A protein has these predicted regions:
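Conserved catalytic core of the tyrosine transesterase superfamily
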Residues: 1-273
Length: 273
């Protein structure tokens, strides 16, 4: 019989005290549940076996997320010395699967032309604010009216998400036309706040409809596009790091790199020998 976690509720409370996102808390709890359902106990042998299984079936980034959850639980239960080492992630020298500015503009134009106004604004808000999809779902009419939205990231750090004037004014006109004067901007067909999964799924559906590669149409792709466009217009990486909510400017430096398709285009033009 598998050993059950008898401290799961306190562990969840411990996680929530750290101001982690709901997705992170859910992911950590799921990881611990999976481990206890499949391994007898938190022995070094079982921990290494679990890590080996992760390495066989998942990408390094996912492996590290699972290891981070395990290590959190081990620290919580006083077993710090048993924590697992994370695996090294080889950083690519190019950005991958980022929507081009041309496709971003085309996507918006098609949504608007077809009368899919709410989704037109979903794409525009993602591309013009740099919001994470979880942040987008929290934006309210009140935030649109004042032009910004304060967020508290991990560790209680304040980040202000700005809504640019052009987007703000057009969004206000749209919200007025549908008589939405308060509350969340983006709702589902039941009148409830839309989910992150709902956004991701619908974006893929529209991408297919308009002939845009679904590989580049996902919520975070528009955050990447925001960063790329920002640096092309205003080359201040320190400011961008603040706007993106990055803890380290090194994280932001990736946006100084070209996408794989941009690299290919440059090579095709330059290398003629």
């Amino acid at each position: 019989m598998k050993k059950q976690i008898n401290q799961q509720t306190p562990f969840e409370q411990h996680l929530r005290k750290q101001n982690l996102s709901e997705n992170t808390v859910t992911s950590y709890l799921w990881t611990i549940k999976y481990f206890t359902d499949n391994y007898e106990d938190f022995s070094k042998e079982n921990l290494l076996a679990y890590k080996g299984w992760l390495l066989e079936y998942f990408k390094p980034k996912t492996v590290n997320l699972r290891i981070q959850a395990i290590n959190k639980y081990l620290a919580f239960t006083g077993k710090d010395k048993m924590q697992l080492k994370q695996v090294k992630v080889q950083q690519k020298n190019f950005l991958e699967n980022v929507i081009s500015n041309a496709d971003y503009q085309y996507f918006k134009a098609q949504l608007k032309a077809d009368g899919n106004i709410e989704w037109y604004f979903v794409v525009w808000f993602l591309g013009a604010t740099g919001a994470r999809v979880s942040e987008l779902t929290q934006i309210k009419v009140e935030h649109v009216n004042i032009g910004w939205f304060d967020l508290y990231s991990k560790g209680g750090k304040l980040r202000r998400l700005y809504i640019p004037k052009l987007l703000r004014e057009e969004a206000q006109a749209w919200l007025k036309s549908i008589d939405r004067t308060f509350g969340y901007v983006f709702l589902n067909r039941f009148g409830e706040r839309i989910t992150t999964r709902g956004i991701a799924t619908q974006l893929k559906t529209y991408a297919t409809k308009y002939g845009i590669s679904t590989k580049v149409v996902y919520p975070h792709s528009f955050r990447h596009r925001y960063a790329k466009n920002f640096l092309e217009k205003f080359n201040d990486i320190s400011l961008l790091a603040d706007l993106m909510g990055h803890e380290s400017i090194e994280t932001t430096r990736i946006y100084l790199r070209r996408t794989a398709s941009e690299q290919q285009e440059i090579v095709d033009q330059i290398v003629t020998w």
